[in-house]
Amino acid sequence: SLTHRKFGGSGGSPFSGLSSIAVRSGSYLDXIIIDGVHHGGSGGNLSPTFTFGSGEYISNMTIRSGDYIDNISFETNMGRRFGPYGGSGGSANTLSNVKVIQINGSAGDYLDSLDIYYEQY
């Protein structure tokens, strides 16, 4: 069954999607680029773009967050890894043995929140 968990704060403008991901980060996440669309600010360093293969999905994900998204990392069902990108602030939350269906969120000058839609295994 599909469920979701929201991390981070209440600011920013909403977005959603999921076929490729990149981030801009320094001590926290300035922006997330999903399917080539930039959500957030222009600070920080740009990560390589992670493009999902056929049948590939996020199976384990760790997000550090407080009022903003501080750090993100994930591993796919095919063993490929992304991150960690960002800093050590906020509290860590891990989603394990999941199939991430969609990533929604909100962003302004920084990445305010992520709302992860997933199936639990």
UniProtKB/Swiss-Prot annotation:
PROSITE patterns, per database record: JACALIN_LECTIN
Entry annotated with the keyword Transmembrane: no
Alphabetical UniProt keywords: Lectin, Mannose-binding
GO molecular function, one term: carbohydrate binding
Pfam families: Jacalin
Residue ranges of every copy of the Jacalin-type lectin domain listed in the record: 1-120
SMART domains, sorted: Jacalin
Family: Belongs to the jacalin lectin family.
Summary of the function given for this chain in its UniProt record: Mixed specificity lectin with anti-HIV activity. Binds to HIV envelope glycoproteins, including exterior membrane glycoprotein gp120, and inhibits viral entry into cells. Binding to gp120 is dependent on gp120 being glycosylated, and is inhibited by mannose, glucose and N-acetylglucosamine.
Protein's UniProt name: Griffithsin
Source organism: Griffithsia sp. (strain Q66D336) (Red alga)
